[in-house]
């Protein structure tokens, strides 16, 4: 490992990769707006993996919500997309949670999603995580050509704007107004999308009886590819041809090799600082 090549697959990452385009989405208002636009354009498949996927969440607020052609509430949006295009496949994989988090999350999530969406939307709760652990990968892959990844879930008490006002009429959760919240997601295209698409399918296959839709081989994820059709309109690429890697934490589970890639990556980055 050198300063010019910090990524070492099998040690501090699962795979090293490249992103054709990358844009950071700072704070949830920007992330949800970009996500809404990308979902509205989807034609092939949508994979949503998260700590939570709450059907009640409004992705848009204010004038964006008033002027949108597609529904703002995420369950309505996915139902609209699934009905608009019966051939699209949508997969929702949420952590099954523990009793400690029941008050923070939507009750009977799998049944709620199944009631609110048509049959081409499939929902699973991941209960393979050992007791005491949780599922913290927050990944959305759209048409196998675009990926959102980072720290934000589609969950209650997440939405906020960049200015973080002390009080906000729009910053309301099930229990009323909540305090400002800062977080970051990013949207990427290029070869890294195929890596994320492989990862989310592996996650799905571990808990579901059905196999997910095959990877869309015609998706242009090369380093010379044009901006994908599903790229969110109001968020132009900020970086091009970025070296990156996927680092995971995998606990001891049946028939799965554990991994401490995130820990190792952080230590390697600190050592090279």
Segments (PLM) and residue ranges:
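Charged, low-complexity intrinsically disordered terminal segments
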Residues: 1-273
């Amino acid at each position: 490992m050198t300063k010019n090549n910090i990524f070492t697959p099998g040690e501090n990452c699962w795979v090293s990769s490249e992103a054709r385009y990358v844009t950071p989405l700072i704070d949830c208002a920007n992330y949800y707006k970009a996500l809404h636009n990308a979902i509205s354009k989807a034609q092939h498949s949508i994979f949503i993996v998260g700590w939570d996927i709450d059907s009640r969440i409004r992705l848009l607020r204010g004038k964006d919500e008033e002027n949108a052609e597609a529904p703002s509430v995420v369950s309505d949006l996915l139902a609209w997309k699934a009905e608009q295009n019966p051939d699209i496949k949508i997969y929702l994989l949420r952590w099954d949670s523990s009793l400690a988090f029941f008050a923070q999350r939507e009750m009977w999530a799998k049944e709620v999603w199944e009631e609110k969406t048509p049959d081409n939307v499939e929902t699973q709760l991941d209960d393979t995580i050992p007791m005491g652990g949780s599922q913290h990968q927050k990944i959305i892959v759209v048409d196998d050509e675009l990926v959102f990844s980072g720290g934000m879930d589609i969950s209650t008490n997440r939405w906020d704007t960049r200015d973080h006002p002390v009080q906000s009429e729009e910053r309301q959760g099930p229990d009323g107004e909540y305090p400002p919240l800062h977080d970051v997601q990013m949207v990427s295209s290029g070869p890294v999308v195929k890596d994320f698409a492989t990862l989310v399918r592996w996650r799905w296959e571990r808990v579901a009886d059905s196999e997910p839709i095959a990877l869309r081989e015609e998706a242009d994820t090369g380093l010379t590819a044009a901006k994908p059709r599903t790229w969110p309109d109001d968020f132009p690429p900020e970086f091009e041809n970025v070296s990156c890697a996927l680092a995971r934490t995998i606990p001891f589970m049946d028939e799965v090799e554990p991994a401490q890639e995130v820990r190792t990556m952080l230590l390697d980055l600190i050592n090279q600082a």
